[in-house]
Design a protein with these regions (language model features):
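Nucleotidyltransferase catalytic core that binds NTPs
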Residues: 1-141
């Protein structure tokens, strides 16, 4: 009797200030794959209009590696770098936010099934940054 092949999935991002929303993304991702690869971007502000991460790459890598839903963490620098890595990736499914429906994303032309995460929550890194800022501001004033 042969063992069924494991379904490999992947998701990509900076995953700065890892929060409950990220956990829900990874948890949902594991419902559509057996092995989850997280592509971690070093600094998204390099080639896109995104915030520079607060946490260092090693900090984010250590946190991601410790999450029970994440099986593997791989690093990429730019969207071009990510595309090159995805071209050679042996995976079945890409997990991406529902806000990307109808939009072009890096690797949209590659032969991966796409699963749009539901995002049935209001957690976000931007909201967390603001909460921390307001809490620190309140302590000082």
């Amino acid at each position: 009797m042969t063992t069924p092949a494991k379904k490999v999935g992947f998701t990509c991002g900076a995953f700065d200030l890892c929060h409950a929303g990220h956990m829900l993304v990874f948890k949902e991702a594991k419902t559509v794959c057996d092995h989850l690869i997280v592509f971690l971007q070093d600094d998204p502000s390099i080639d896109r209009a995104k915030n520079k991460p607060v946490m260092s790459l090693p900090e984010r890598q250590i946190i991601l590696a410790g999450i029970k839903y994440v099986d593997e963490v791989r690093i990429y620098t730019t969207e071009v770098d990510l595309y090159e890595k995805l071209k050679n990736l042996k995976a079945d499914i890409r997990i991406i936010g529902a806000d990307w429906k109808g939009k072009q994303f890096t690797g949209h032309d590659l032969p991966f099934e796409v699963y749009y995460n539901s995002r049935s929550h209001n957690f976000s890194t931007s909201a967390l940054r603001e909460r921390v800022y307001l809490a620190e501001y309140a302590k000082r004033h």
